[in-house]
Amino acid sequence: MKGGASGGTLASMIEAVKAAKNDVRLRKEMGNPYILCPEKKDLSHRQVSVRGPVFDQDFQSWSGPFIMEAINARVVLRSHMLSGMPYGNNFLYREQMITGKGFKGRLSALTLSTMLGLFAVGVFMTPTRKILQRFLPKPGEGPSPEAQAAGYFDISLLGKTASGEKLDVQVTGDRDPGYGCTAKMLAQSGLSLAFDFDEADREGGFWTPATLMGDKLINRLIDHAGMTFDLK
């Protein structure tokens, strides 16, 4: 993966941390992986996130935390709920950054984990947060068009059943994941909503892309957004 962060994204993260620091209820909600599933009250199976360097046996590689898991996992869990719990009440989902094998991979995972941890602590504490804000990009600043065009992402999705069966999907994008590709995803999502559905196809509500648009959106992303989805 190759991409950058904008000042607006960082400012949003900082404001969320500031709000949670002063609100116990908000902190609990932000720490609840099922916060987007209020319609189903019996979801209590513990989700396990990668917090530090971990050697992943499936990929035979070291890995560290992925900063977007806190958002992505909650959307996936809501999709699962809206789909009728097809994977069962014990469904687990997590994301992590693969850093490679051997000593170099372990060191990269440790560095990644340490930097994210220090950033989180720095943002949480007022004095260090003010210092960080002097050096971080400001809202409106971010990756240049050239940097976005040079970016990319490569995601490995591995599904495992209770009986041990595995399903592997590779997803790639040809632009910066946070901006170049995200802009195309948003555009194709809007076009899908406008042209791929009759009004009677879906009721209103708090849907996710997977449960509302599904394969129709995937086809658009393949045809018009420079993305690939490869089932292995």
Give the role of each language-model region:
Residues M1-K232:
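C-terminal catalytic/substrate-binding lobe primarily of soluble NAD(P)-dependent oxidoreductases
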